[in-house]
Amino acid sequence: MAEGRSSKNSPSGQIDIVQVDGLTVLKIIKHCEEEGSSGDLVQGVLLGLIQDNRLEITNCFPFPSNKAGDDEDDDDVNYQMEVMRRLRAVNIDHLHVGWYQSTYLGSYINRTLLDSQYSYQKSIEESVVLIYDPLRTSQGMLTLKAFRLSDEMMKLYKDGEFSADKLSKAGISFHSMFQEIPLVIKNSSLMNVLLCELDENTPTPSADQFLTLSTGSYLEKNVRVLMESVDELCQDSNKYHNYQRSVIRQQQQKENYLQRRQQENQSRIQRGEDPLPDEDLSKMFKPLPVPSRLDNLLLSEQVNTYCQHVHQFSTQSFGKFFLAQALQDKKE
């Protein structure tokens, strides 16, 4: 990974917009379609520059596919350094500004993404991650989004404590973990002319296809992964509830012990005996380890993402359905 800052024009690391070259988008799509066609995760490096609060992504290259038994870390670092050295030799933008990865049905909110993006932003403050979903794109919607960790999440991750109290004090919820940056795709003038020419020469599809309802397999897959994530979220919530019950039970045991001890001391004093010696209650009632709420945050955000996908898909399908029904009624 490249170290140091890639620009002096954005001292705060604030990025308001991400601008991606059309050719770079095609490279990302080509890599994800070829290497990730079977659902495998593919990743790559983003190169570019920073102008004020705009991050311009002008090039990219994929991570190599490591086989079992390879020294992946050393190979990846050597590969990246060699590619960037060759790009620098031919005067191509070689500044490391982030990374990209593919996803399946939006299943990208996990610890791996969080750890990787934290490492990138710690080294290069303005870096982002691009998420591309080939399956949703095949449904007619180019799904390419840019994310970065919020400043609050970066501070909390640095401390390494994700207890409920820490999250509450920091004001972090699953909505504020990641910050989505507006993304625009920029093409050259010649590219725009070519696209217009291709659009004019492309045969017009049959007029009766615009009301074709989408297949239910996509919705079925989304609902299935949504149910799996909800089950995991329920299990994580049950673990935290068990912890809370254990804390309450331990506190009750501690209060009962102190009450019995106080009664015993009063009885000993009445009999003219010395009270019981002081004891270290922290050894008798050891504090229970506070469970991390990080998994709960990630699962909540993942469930929210699945719900948004189902909502968008259902809205489009219902719109077509009602329009088709109105046309059919008018025809009759």
UniProtKB/Swiss-Prot annotation:
<dbReference type="InterPro" id="IPR027524">
    <property type="entry name" value="eIF3h"/>
</dbReference>
<dbReference type="GO" id="GO:0003743">
    <property type="term" value="F:translation initiation factor activity"/>
</dbReference>
<dbReference type="GO" id="GO:0033290">
    <property type="term" value="C:eukaryotic 48S preinitiation complex"/>
</dbReference>
<dbReference type="InterPro" id="IPR000555">
    <property type="entry name" value="JAMM/MPN+_dom"/>
</dbReference>
<dbReference type="Pfam" id="PF01398">
    <property type="entry name" value="JAB"/>
</dbReference>
<keyword id="KW-0963">Cytoplasm</keyword>
<protein>
    <recommendedName>
        <fullName>Eukaryotic translation initiation factor 3 subunit H</fullName>
    </recommendedName>
</protein>
<comment type="function">
    <text>Component of the eukaryotic translation initiation factor 3 (eIF-3) complex, which is involved in protein synthesis of a specialized repertoire of mRNAs and, together with other initiation factors, stimulates binding of mRNA and methionyl-tRNAi to the 40S ribosome. The eIF-3 complex specifically targets and initiates translation of a subset of mRNAs involved in cell proliferation.</text>
</comment>
<comment type="similarity">
    <text>Belongs to the eIF-3 subunit H family.</text>
</comment>
<dbReference type="InterPro" id="IPR050242">
    <property type="entry name" value="JAMM_MPN+_peptidase_M67A"/>
</dbReference>
<keyword id="KW-0396">Initiation factor</keyword>
<dbReference type="GO" id="GO:0006413">
    <property type="term" value="P:translational initiation"/>
</dbReference>
<dbReference type="GO" id="GO:0001732">
    <property type="term" value="P:formation of cytoplasmic translation initiation complex"/>
</dbReference>
<dbReference type="GO" id="GO:0005852">
    <property type="term" value="C:eukaryotic translation initiation factor 3 complex"/>
</dbReference>
<dbReference type="Pfam" id="PF19445">
    <property type="entry name" value="eIF3h_C"/>
</dbReference>
<keyword id="KW-0648">Protein biosynthesis</keyword>
<comment type="subunit">
    <text>Component of the eukaryotic translation initiation factor 3 (eIF-3) complex.</text>
</comment>
<feature type="domain" description="MPN">
    <location>
        <begin position="18"/>
        <end position="153"/>
    </location>
</feature>
<dbReference type="GO" id="GO:0008237">
    <property type="term" value="F:metallopeptidase activity"/>
</dbReference>
<dbReference type="GO" id="GO:0016282">
    <property type="term" value="C:eukaryotic 43S preinitiation complex"/>
</dbReference>
<dbReference type="InterPro" id="IPR037518">
    <property type="entry name" value="MPN"/>
</dbReference>
<feature type="region of interest" description="Disordered">
    <location>
        <begin position="251"/>
        <end position="285"/>
    </location>
</feature>
<dbReference type="InterPro" id="IPR045810">
    <property type="entry name" value="eIF3h_C"/>
</dbReference>
